[in-house]
């Protein structure tokens, strides 16, 4: 009966091992989690299992395959279950158990075993639609399990480091939560994304682009900062600045429009942030009031960098159709090559909305709105200054080559008469008092967030993965799609 995988099963025969175990705490209970490394063909991944899950699988299989004499280490009734020698011995016994499972095709092809090892998970199977360019440029001998963590020796991060207090936002792939770090009581916005949804929609490039852009935001006052990121086998976590003055969209809805000096102030801070992104060859591509936050003092903070395009210099173009319909530039709708000037179009659209209460070419019918953007002249109603009219006309120029910012990018925006009364140096140093104070009561005040979000129940699953599959920032990660996601801060920003 003792036989290894024969040639007929060579393609699907898994290789398994338990390289390590870790102690975890949940609701004041301690338990040991065993990390199972699974390899099938060129794919590798980790599965994190408790002893009880091994025991459940064992009891299921021994009834169906009594002749195979499977065994696992017995439960310990007396003594310390967390004694290092005991855990080492138990891990060896569990390792022997799973080694026996993969020696027999009838066992490793059994649904219970495949589920235990997550062999049918979509994220462990190659994607036949992967671009040929991506395949050809990938390194054939590179390991899939290395994470770029920055300086070595940085501490681990995991969901249980936080108390998740409130839902404060929601997107296509997950939620944004207000979280309090247990170590020091500091508040953060933690963006939690479901890997499964990201992978199913083939959006991992956008997620990694968002991470990369966030890492470059550290030194700009009007861009949200990433403190660190980490992952479990099911979720991705961005630990971000908690900015609690509310979305510009929230305040616009409440006030309908802003006085021109207030709109000018916000437009200047937004332009400064966009100019910085352009200087490091990043096009933002998704400027809209929902992505513009106010901090506790009333300064602008841009967030949500999922649609950013990296590596675009002032003379470069790209062609991807993306963004939000109300704010799309004509060249994007036409699917023509576009460049940095799409961001200046969006700035014009947001400035128009701040002054007049609606985007410039808004229509409930999206097709008609696209037609308006492409062909309808800009309607500038009374109530704003001549310089405001001028900058709106120049930013919302349908020909990108004639648009304000086409030649010298942010410098042209800075030099426009609309901003003549501003000192850009004082602006970046936050020496200009904001025209509106959100009047937040403290670092955890959520009054400026929509009750649609804050009244939601915080999902328990964000605190611990359902299969106890905690992946610290220092462990090897076997998911190709998110290699490099985990990020630990440089030494001056250590969080432990």
Swiss-Prot record:
Q: Which residues carry this modification: Phosphoserine?
A: 126, 129, 486
Signal peptide segment = none
Q: Where in the cell is it found?
A: Cytoplasmic vesicle; Early endosome; Recycling endosome
- Catalytic reaction equation(s): L-seryl-[protein] + ATP = O-phospho-L-seryl-[protein] + ADP + H(+); L-threonyl-[protein] + ATP = O-phospho-L-threonyl-[protein] + ADP + H(+)
- This protein's source sits in the domain of life called Eukaryota
Offer one example of a GO biological process linked to this entry: negative regulation of extrinsic apoptotic signaling pathway in absence of ligand
Q: Which molecular function GO terms apply here?
A: ATP binding; molecular adaptor activity; phosphatidylinositol binding; protein serine kinase activity; protein serine/threonine kinase activity
Q: Which residues form the PX domain?
A: 12-124
Domain Protein kinase: start-end pairs: 162-419
The AGC-kinase C-terminal domain covers 420-496
Q: Does the keyword Phosphoprotein apply?
A: yes
Subunit note: Interacts with GSK3B and FLII. Interacts with PDPK1 in a phosphorylation-dependent manner.
Specify the protein name. Serine/threonine-protein kinase Sgk3
